[in-house]
Swiss-Prot record:
Catalytic activity field: alpha-D-xylose = alpha-D-xylulofuranose
Main localization category: cytoplasm
Family label: Belongs to the xylose isomerase family.
GO molecular function per UniProt: magnesium ion binding; xylose isomerase activity
Keywords: Carbohydrate metabolism, Cytoplasm, Isomerase, Magnesium, Metal-binding, Xylose metabolism
Covalent S-S links between cysteines: none
Gene, per the UniProt record: xylA
Protein name as annotated: Xylose isomerase
Manner of cofactor binding, per the entry note: Binds 2 magnesium ions per subunit.
Subcellular location per the Swiss-Prot or TrEMBL entry: Cytoplasm
Annotated PROSITE patterns: XYLOSE_ISOMERASE
Catalytic activity, EC: 5.3.1.5
Biological classification of the source: Bacteria, Pseudomonadati, Pseudomonadota, Alphaproteobacteria, Hyphomicrobiales
Residue positions binding Mg(2+) 1: 231, 267, 295, 338
Source organism per UniProt: Rhizobium leguminosarum bv. trifolii (strain WSM2304)
Amino acid sequence: MSTGFFGDIQKVKYEGPDSTNPLAFRYYQPDEIVMGKRMEDHLRFAVAYWHTFTWPGGDPFGGQTFLRPWFEDTMKAAKLKADVAFEFFSLLGSPYYCFHDADVRPEGKNFAENTKNLNEIVDYFAEKQASTGTKLLWGTANLFSNRRYMSGAATNPDPDVFAFAAATVKTCIDATQKLGGENYVLWGGREGYETLLNTDLKRELDQLGRFLNLVVEYKHKIGYTGTILIEPKPQEPTKHQYDYDVATVYGFLKKHGLENEVKLNIEQGHAILAGHSFEHELALANALGIFGSIDMNRNDYQSGWDTDQFPNNVPEMALAYYHVLAGGGFKTGGTNFDSKLRRQSLDPADLLIGHIGGMDCCARGLKAAARMIEDKALSQPLADRYAGWESAEAQKLFRGEYSLDEITNWVETKDVNPQPRSGKQELLENVVNRYV
């Protein structure tokens, strides 16, 4: 039943590249077969509950611009928000959604009331999922907005805050499991510091390791079969975040023996903040065996902070999905639109239009990536570039069968005098542009 929030807008349909209808897909066709799989099953789109239905439109210089009828901290408002959200998922045809606990339930006076409120809304969500067919990609806990977390959650100097946060995560894992969520995400929003003058760096990292081990232990205890994901971010809101980027998180997981238990949810905007390209973070996560899922958005390249805009750059999407596909595609992860409207985009239709544009952009990127893989447009030049390593002698070198003395003798007796070869970067950049 319609809530009336979206007026007379009908379910978004595919109309083809020539369509000028802003409420239609031009490239995203859920049932189109790409590399032997439905496009919907490749992309596994999800809507972010927080930016789409909870963000009030404020910025550092001004307050709320969005006037939503559910902007009250009551259970009645939470259920109205859920009604609108699931109507939105159905109109858009999004197979998944994601949420923080604080996005979906009113704030209680204590932990017990928060848990009661969360359980009530989870029961409501279960009914909505059953009636719409929309599924939960992942759940998570908001351990950064409330003032109790101003000095961190797992890394807080107060053990009571650590305990409150750990108990909150338990309830959120329970909620995620009950709703059939395929992943559970940990984002260390305030797991970092502003100054070393009041920070015991080693202690905080050890606390974070203990916290993550507790989560993994609980996952196995209750038989939760989803994937635990960490989302890296270099700064914001703290100056120095402990989960800076893929490489940093991998080192942390390795130190605590969790590299086979936890994978990463990689956000495009966070990669940019860390000084990396999106495809760098995806390729590195694949190389390290910890790729899990994507938060899809983009940052303004001039602003220098996290702007969470909808993706609109097809070449960037093509390279991103190239690495997703090259790594075997999503397993339990997907493409979550961690994107928000600009604060002047007030119309309900703008929510749909932003997601439609993002989904079309991703669809174009996916199809370009698939063609590049099928044509070996990048993989063959890569194989040719490293072909020398396929020789018998080079394989022995790679496997560690030669000592430094033996390698030196080989170079001398064979009079090895290598000459550089072109890296062909311009050619490969032109190849990518041919596909997009």
